[in-house]
Amino acid sequence: MEALRNVFDFSDFPRIDLVVVGMVALFLVVFPLLPHSSFAMATMIQFLMFSLYGMGWNTIGGYGGQVDLGKAQYLGIGAFTTAVMLIRWDVPFWVSMPIGVALAVTWSFIIGYPLFRLTGHYFAIATIATSLVLKDIFEVWDFVGAARGLEISPIKYSPPDFLRLIFKEDIYYYYIILGFFFLGILYVNWFRKSRLGFQLRSIKDNEDVAQSLGINVHWAKIKTYAIATAFVSLVGSFHACYIKNIEPEDTMSLDLSILIALMAMLGGAGSLWGPIIGAGVLIPLKSYLKEWLGAKAGLVGIDLIIYAVIIMLISAVEPRGIWGIIEKIRRRKRA
C-alpha cells in the first residue's frame, strides 16, 4: 500500500510545479485535437519517446551517477525483437514487446556484472564498446536483416491494427506512447522514493560509505541498470512499429546513445522532470535542424555540434542542468 501511495505522491514538489505539470499534461492530452501539421505530430511523438529514453537513462545515470553511453544497444534489441517476431511469425506487439524487454534485460545482466566492476570513465567507455560490438553483430546477422535492416510492411495488415500497432494515422501512435509516458513518470516517481532509489543516491554520494552501511553496491547498480534497460527496450519496440523501417546503423548508433544521455543531463540528471525538460528542448531543435539546416542546407552533423554547444553553455552556468538553474533561482528568491 505504501508503494502505491509513493507512485502518486508528488508532495515534495512546490505547488507551482504541479500546476505547470498539470497544464503540460492537459496540453499533451488535447494536442492531437488542436490544429497541427504532420511535422508537429511527428515531433511530439519523438518528444514522448525520447522523454522515456531519458527517464530510463536517468535511473542509472542521474540517480546512480553511472554515465552510460551505450543505451542504443537496448533500443535495438527491443526494436529488432518486435520487427523479427512480427515479420517472421506475425506475433502481435503486445507479446513481442515484453519478450524484447526480457531479452534486453537479460543482456544487461550478462554485461552488467563485469561492467560495474569498472568506475568513472572506464565504465562509460566500456558501455560504448559493448554497444558498438552488438551493433556490428547485428549488421552481419542475416536473421535480423543484417546492415539493410528490416521493414514492416503495413500493406499486409488492415489498419487500424491495435494488436500489431499498425496504423495509418499517427494519432494512434501518439496516444499509445503518451500512455507509456505517463506510466513512466509514475514509475520513476515511485523509484526515487524506493529503497533501491535511496541506495543509488547513497552510492552516488559516496560508494565506500554506502558499502559500509551494508548496501550491496554492485547488485544495486546491476538492478538499476536493468530497470533503465527495460525503459529503453520498451520504447524501442514501439519505435519499430512506428518507424517501420529499422537499420542497425540508425537504431543502435553511438550518436543516439549520446543524445539520450545529453537530454537527461541538459534537463537535469537526478531529477524527475529533467529528462522531460531536456527532451522538450532538444527534440524540437533536433527536428528543426535536420529539416532546415541538415537536409536542405546540406550541413550534415550540424545538430550534434549545436547540442554540444548548448550542453557546454548550460554546464558553465549550472552543472545540474536546466532544473538546477530553476532551483537556484528559487533559492535566490527565498533569500
Segments the model singles out, each with a brief description of its role:
Residues M1-A335:
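Transmembrane alpha-helices and adjacent helix-loop boundaries
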